[in-house]
Amino acid sequence: MDMNNESENELPSIQLKIERRSSHPWIFQKMVEKPRGNTGRVANGCIVNVVERDGKWVGRGLYNAHSRIALRILTAKQDEAIDRQFFSRKIQQAYQLRQEILQLNRVTDAYRLIHSEADGLSGLVVDRFADCWVLEFFASGMYYLRETIQSVLLDLAPQSNFYWFAEDHVCKQESFDCRSPAPPEPFLIQENGLKFRVAPGSKHKTGFFLDQRDNRRRLSQFCSGKTVLDLCCNSGGFGIYAKTLGKAQEVTGIDLDEQVLTLAKQNAQLNQATIRYIQADLFTWLRDIAPSGRTFDVVILDPAKLTRDRESVDQALRKYRDMNRLAMQAVAPGGILLTCSCTGLVSEADFLDMVRQAAWQAGREALVFQICGAASDHPFMLHASEGRYLKAVFCRIL
């Protein structure tokens, strides 16, 4: 997309059907009039001006007639163009938060730079892994602007390389074809003195679960001399923290995915951590060990997202309840359970109620002593709470 062809006054104008009563950057299709008259056909993903029925200014942003989210407002300032300077300002602001305020460079060379709406760039996520920027697109318009975004990122880190992608369901919803480059070979990042091999382009997010950084460190504080069970261990983050920084006596990691277990074993070796990894379905494995009465002092349960569909939330909660019940039965009396959900459609209140139900079914008591979310490089706006998706609940199981 050429950002220099049209001034802001020459952009297509999209009119709303009703008065806008929210500052949320999303405007849904049902609220938007179809382009007509002088506006003519408006290309999906292009930048448009947005006005109310009476012509009152709303903002400027990305338009997509095929998406449920028809408009993503990027600025409410009538005199602010969506150009390279705009992206430079937004990315610099985000960089200042991560480096000057949060000072993440003291802790890691891998962090989230752009967290979509929270950083003023709806439809875009940017993660940094050492010298590689990984861009994930949730809006066709952001995908079409990727060259501009990359050029700004190169201003921050001139020696960087890039990988970008959009998940299949996003491409379908947004009606665009995201052509990703060849993924880079796995490489190393560091976090809190530990090393991890990351693989952007693998099927598990952008390469590593950056959102759990603070929770990994927090969990390790409870592991000294303990036996630890890491369910849905993925590439090994929680278990490796528990064994190295936490000085756990014994760590067992369970995951069904052979690919991520290979990565977990490599990460354990990088950090000289002796960890037992088992490829298994957690439901089957936990049911199999139950008759023996085997328990662990610390259990982590961090499954992948269970649903993207509002109609399936109740089903997801039932699955969470079943796996939490089994996990609680594997916790030694007085032990610790860290149970997590990255399913944004499941509210914190509903997740906590699920934990209550699971404890009752397991014949245990769950004493919640801390509730956390994503790491601080995943901020959220109070008027766009979708960015606050992760629930990490620390419980003592009695």
Each model region followed by its residue ranges:
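A short, charged
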Residues: 85-89, 93-100, 158-174, 220-246
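Non-catalytic substrate-recognition/targeting regions of SAM-dependent transferases
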Residues: 114-127, 143-209, 217
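Rossmann-like S-adenosyl-L-methionine
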Residues: 181-398
